[in-house]
C-alpha cells in the first residue's frame, strides 16, 4: 500500500504503527516510527540509538477520567530529541449525541448505554479533553500548560 501512495502522491507521509512489531519491512512500509502509548523510556531508547526515522506517538495520554498524569515526561522529550515529533491525545473530543431528555425536556449529551443498547462501552466514549458540546474539560488546563497555550 505504501508503494501505491508514494506513486500517486510522492510527498505523502505514510504511517503504519505496527512496523515496530516486525522490522523486516521498516524501510519501505512507513515513513515514521510510531507507537501507541509507548512509555517515555521506550521513546527515549529509540531516539538514542541513531534512528533512521522520526518518532510520533500516534496515540498517547488517553484522558478517561483523570488520566493525563505523566504528560510532562513526554513533553520534556521534545526539547531533547530533534527526531521526536510528539503525539496525538486520544481522544480529543467526547463522542456523544445531543438529545432531548424525555423527563426534563432539556438538551443532554448521551452515549454508550444511555439508549439501552447492549453490549455497550458505557462511558468509554467520554474520554476526550473537550466535551461533545465543545466545552473544555478540566484536563484541557494541563494540555494548554504543557503545549504552551496558557493565557
Predicted regions and their residues:
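Substrate-binding clefts and catalytic carboxylate motifs of secreted carbohydrate-active enzymes
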Residues: 30, 42, 46-151
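Active-site neighborhood of glycoside hydrolase catalytic domains
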Residues: 1-53, 80
Amino acid at each position: 500500500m505504501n508503494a501505491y501512495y508514494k506513486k500517486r502522491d510522492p510527498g505523502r507521509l505514510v504511517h503504519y504503527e505496527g512496523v515496530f512489531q516486525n522490522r523486516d519491512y521498516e524501510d519501505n512500509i512507513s515513513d515514521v516510527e510510531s507507537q501507541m502509548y509507548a512509555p517515555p523510556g521506550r521513546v527515549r531508547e529509540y531516539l538514542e540509538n541513531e534512528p533512521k526515522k522520526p518518532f510520533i506517538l500516534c496515540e498517547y495520554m488517553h484522558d478517561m477520567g483523570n488520566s493525563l498524569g505523566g504528560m510532562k515526561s513526554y513533553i520534556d522529550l521534545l526539547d531533547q530529541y530533534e527526531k521526536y515529533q510528539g503525539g496525538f491525545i486520544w481522544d480529543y473530543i467526547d463522542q456523544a449525541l445531543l438529545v432531548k431528555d424525555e423527563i426534563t425536556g432539556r438538551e443532554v449529551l448521551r452515549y454508550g448505554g444511555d439508549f439501552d443498547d447492549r453490549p455497550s462501552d458505557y462511558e468509554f466514549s467520554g474520554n476526550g479533553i473537550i466535551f461533545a458540546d465543545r466545552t473544555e474539560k478540566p484536563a484541557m488546563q494541563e494540555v494548554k500548560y504543557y503545549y504552551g497555550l496558557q493565557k
